[in-house]
Amino acid sequence: QRQMCIRDSRKMSEYGLQLREKQKAKFIYGVLEKPFRNYYKKAKQMTGMTGENLMVLLESRLDNVVFRMGFARTRREARQIVDHKHVLVNGKQVNIPSYLIKAGDVIEIKEAKKSSPRYKEIVEVTGGRLVPEWIDVDAEALKGTVKELPKREVIDVPVDEMLIVELYSK
């Protein structure tokens, strides 16, 4: 599954493909190198397939779940919303974008922020977005529940996590 490099006619090396997949995943989820490596280490210690565990960990980040629920237009905006203390997890304020969500967690926008025009606009824009099956969302109340952690097959991110595992296991 080698692809042509845009800049020249040579095929990309195995390392180049692996590095590109890692950079793609880091960019999609907005994670820097050191935290990304820590997610890999944590995924490796978990039971099951390391690559799938890595994707589940990245998908379980609070900023990503806020994005998936449709409370933000982009993951970057979701990160800012969490950072600015607009989000409650199980009724408690959490302002750490990397906070890992568990099954059963209830995520909502703070009561004081719900009436802001910003969230009305966001819900209008993201209303047509498909919410993953592992999340229940009440868009009107800006509240959602994580039914279960996602399985790899329902994560629609175009990343080949096995290449990332190969890269880090060198």
Predicted feature descriptions by range:
Residues 3, 7-69, 96-170:
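Ferredoxin-like alpha/beta domains used as RNA- or RNAP-binding modules
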Residues 68, 83, 89:
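Short glycine/serine/threonine-biased micro-segments
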